């Protein structure tokens, strides 16, 4: 079984608004996952005050975790299943791109700019993870999933300009 963990705890300072709520955000990803099949879905919400923003199973970040890499470690320790991490700002992600990640064990997605997206990954073998505070190093042992049909779905959005470009397409 695979547990899908939606990452929705960021401050979205560069975007200027809460990325978890833009264009359906977390709710849209939950719907995509449910269209594919029956999966446990957990939304990591960041601060406890953000819990009411989301439906379903919602976990606040533990206080003892000082960075996202440590939050990822904490989640991995708590979940025995395979884990598919999905950032809430994957606004192009569709069913076919998500399905491709579900069926590919131990992979990190690569976006249309050929950049690895370590937070969009499928973990089946936890022994491949490295102990590191940097995400790129933590997932360095995971092969890239370079599926040309879906690279445009594997891009995240960090700036308002990214979102404007997306909306104008």
Task: Show which residues each predicted segment covers.
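Nucleotide and nucleotide-moiety/phosphate-recognizing core
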Residues: 1-115, 130-135, 141-153, 161-163
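Short glycine- and hydrophobic/aromatic-rich loop-to-beta-strand nucleating segment
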Residues: 117-123, 156
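Aromatic-glycine-rich donor-binding/catalytic loop that engages nucleotide-sugar donors
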Residues: 123-135, 167-169
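Short amphipathic alpha-helical segments
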Residues: 158-169
């Amino acid at each position: 079984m695979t547990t899908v963990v939606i990452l929705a705890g960021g401050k979205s300072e560069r975007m200027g608004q809460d990325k978890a709520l833009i264009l359906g955000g977390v709710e849209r990803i939950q719907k995509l996952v449910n269209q594919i099949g029956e999966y446990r879905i957990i939304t990591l919400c960041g601060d406890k005050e953000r819990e009411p923003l989301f439906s379903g199973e919602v976990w606040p970040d533990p206080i003892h975790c000082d960075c996202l890499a440590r939050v990822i470690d904490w989640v991995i320790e708590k979940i025995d299943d395979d884990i598919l991490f999905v950032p809430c700002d994957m606004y192009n992600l569709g069913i076919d791109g998500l399905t491709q990640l579900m069926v590919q064990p131990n992979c990190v997605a690569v976006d249309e700019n050929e950049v690895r997206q370590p937070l969009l990954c499928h973990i089946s073998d936890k022994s491949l993870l490295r102990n590191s505070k940097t995400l790129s190093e933590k997932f360095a042992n995971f092969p890239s999933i370079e599926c040309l049909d879906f690279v445009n779905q594997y891009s995240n959005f960090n700036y308002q300009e990214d979102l404007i470009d997306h909306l104008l397409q």
